[in-house]
Amino acid sequence: MAGGVGGRVVVGRHVYGNLYGCDSRVLRDEAALITIVKEAVKVANAMLLSIGSYRFGPGGGLTVFAVVAESHISIHTWPEHGFATVDVYTCGDHTDPKAAFDYIVSQLRPKRVEVFFGDRSMYGE
């Protein structure tokens, strides 16, 4: 992974955010969310290992979670509030977590997005 400063080595990049004002029908559509996450894996240039989903009660929110060789991609939804959180964490210079995040946002079409970035780092000895 990309080198760091002062012995710090970035081993992963984390892009995550809050999506407000999403269409609640999409946030309840398990098949659509699974398709979106699978495509986000491709956009990130990651390798899908497994994908799962869980619905929180009838008509409730969903969690869709992809385990990728490089880490994970997830969407958690609260359709009753038109709200979703998205989490994309990848390791390796070959991956692009921001592109995957942007793809998911383009599919959920929120009215407002808060996005955060974090480097996961370690220090050499």
Curated annotation (Swiss-Prot):
GO terms for molecular function: adenosylmethionine decarboxylase activity. Is synthesized initially as an inactive proenzyme. Formation of the active enzyme involves a self-maturation process in which the active site pyruvoyl group is generated from an internal serine residue via an autocatalytic post-translational modification. Two non-identical subunits are generated from the proenzyme in this reaction, and the pyruvate is formed at the N-terminus of the alpha chain, which is derived from the carboxyl end of the proenzyme. It catalyses: S-adenosyl-L-methionine + H(+) = S-adenosyl 3-(methylsulfanyl)propylamine + CO2. Gene3D superfamilies: 3.30.160.750, S-adenosylmethionine decarboxylase domain. It is an enzyme of class 4 (lyase). The record marks 70-71 as: Cleavage (non-hydrolytic). Its EC number is 4.1.1.50. Belongs to the prokaryotic AdoMetDC family. Type 1 subfamily. This is S-adenosylmethionine decarboxylase proenzyme. It comes from Pyrobaculum aerophilum (strain ATCC 51768 / DSM 7523 / JCM 9630 / CIP 104966 / NBRC 100827 / IM2).
